[in-house]
Structures are given as structure tokens and as C-alpha cells.
Amino acid sequence: MSHIRRMPKRTDTLALFDVDGTLTPSRCKASHETLEFLRRLRDEVFTGIVGGSDLVKQEEQLGPTILEDFDYVFSENGLVAYEKGKLIHVQSLAKHLGEEKLKNVINCCLRYIADLDIPLKRGTFVEFRKGMLNVSPIGRNCSQQEREEFEKYDRVHSIRSRFVDYLKERFEGYDLQFSIGGQISFDVFPRGWDKTYCLSFVKHIPVIHFFGDKTFLGGNDYEIFQDARTIGHSVTSPEDTVKQCQQLFNL
């Protein structure tokens, strides 16, 4: 999708996208049709992505040239931020929280998961990222089929939301925020380090349209969807995202 960059026709507008469930099926690759549409959209407005995953996972889903293909790439909610292909900001969870508190949170999560009775458990239950922890009751290295089965199980048994409620009470004094996203996990980060964090890097753009699928209370798109600095659009799939953009931007 990479091409020589020209300024878009509308330099006052940014189309900012969540990744999982918005531009791609959860943890899967974007379709050629979606990527081609994003290329055309970038001729009209500035484009950007914001997600909880690190850059490596974003590249797996959207291609190895995403730093060239989008004007803004915000990994880990913008705690690792790129503008025009250049790294402009890195924030550290370990430095902010401190090793002792971080260790307490990780140990608590692992104990909770050890006692959790669910049909399947695999591996990588807590993933440490630069700006957050990603916690998965089933484990991140489950297969795609196991991922989908857990999502269905979680809808019925509220495994993640109950886990989050427990952690909120347990670490009330740590000023942490918990955000459920994707199919199998939730993120843990200091309050204010949700997706609205990335908006500080685009203050010069007056109109920001945000597109996301987890826009409900407790979802990881909720805060930025509700933020006064954005015009929020709730989507149900990559196809719905493209359709809404076509209507909005007359493409």
C-alpha cells in the first residue's frame, strides 16, 4: 500500500482507526480491499491507527510498511507514537508505576488465573508491553479456533469482566485503568493512558473522526469514542468501517 506521499485534499481532518474488529478481524490480517480503500482515503484526509498492540503485531495485521502507509501510527494506545514514519514518543509503565507495584499486579493476575476454572488454558497469560500489561485468561498463544471459542464462552460467563472487577477492588489505590478489548484479553495501564492518550499528538488537526468497534462502556474504544475532541463512529466489522467512510467522505 506504500506510495509517494502527497498532502491530502483536506488537511484539517484526520480519520483515526482502531485495528482489531475495525480494520481487521481480531488478530487477523487486513484484506486487500480494506488496505486499498485506506490508500485512497489518505488522498482525501490524514489517516492514523491507534491500538493496544505493539508495533510488531500491528505490522502483522496491516503490513510491514504501516509507518509509511499512515500519517500517524499509535502503538499501545499512543504510548509509543509515530508521526510521518518517525518515532516521536515512548512512555514506560515500569518507570511510572515502579517495579514493586508492577510485580504485585502481575503476581495477582497469575494467582487469579491459576485458580480460574475455564475449559482451556494455553500460555502467555500476562504480556508486558512498554506502556501496559495485557492479561489473557486463556493465554495469548491459543489457536484462532480456541480464541473464538473463548470469546463465546466469555460472553456467557463474563470471565474477563469479573477478573477486571476483582483487580479494580484489589488495586484501588494504584490509580489503574482496565480495558477489555479483542477476543481473549484486557489491558491494564495507569489512569489516562487509554486511547485518548494519542490525541495529544494531533492537537493541531481540528477535525478527528474516530472509528472503533469496542465503543461500549468498559470497551477499549469507549474513552476516545466519547471524547469531546473526536467525532466517534461505532462500527461492527472492517466492511462496515469502509462503508461508513465511503458515505462520510464521499468516496
Swiss-Prot record:
Positions annotated as active site in the UniProt record: 18 (nucleophile), 20 (proton donor/acceptor)
Keyword Glycoprotein included in the entry's annotation: no
Main location: cytoplasm
Necessary cofactors: Mg(2+)
Gene3D superfamilies: 3.30.1240.20, HAD superfamily/HAD-like
SUPFAM superfamilies in the record: HAD-like
EC nos: 5.4.2.8
Transmembrane residue ranges: none
Gene Ontology molecular function: metal ion binding; phosphomannomutase activity
InterPro entries: HAD-like_sf, HAD-SF_hydro_IIB, HAD_sf, PMM, PMM_cap
The reaction(s) this protein catalyses: alpha-D-mannose 1-phosphate = D-mannose 6-phosphate
Positions of Mg(2+) 2 binding: 225, 227, 230
Localization in the cell: Cytoplasm
Primary role: Catalyzes the interconversion of mannose-6-phosphate to mannose-1-phosphate, the precursor for the synthesis of GDP-mannose. GDP-mannose is an essential sugar nucleotide for the synthesis of D-mannose-containing cell wall polysaccharides (galactomannans and glucomannans), glycolipids, glycoproteins and the antioxidant L-ascorbate.
Family recorded in the similarity comment: Belongs to the eukaryotic PMM family.
Subunit structure of this chain's protein: Homodimer.
Listed name of the protein: Phosphomannomutase
Upper lineage: Eukaryota, Rhodophyta, Bangiophyceae, Galdieriales, Galdieriaceae
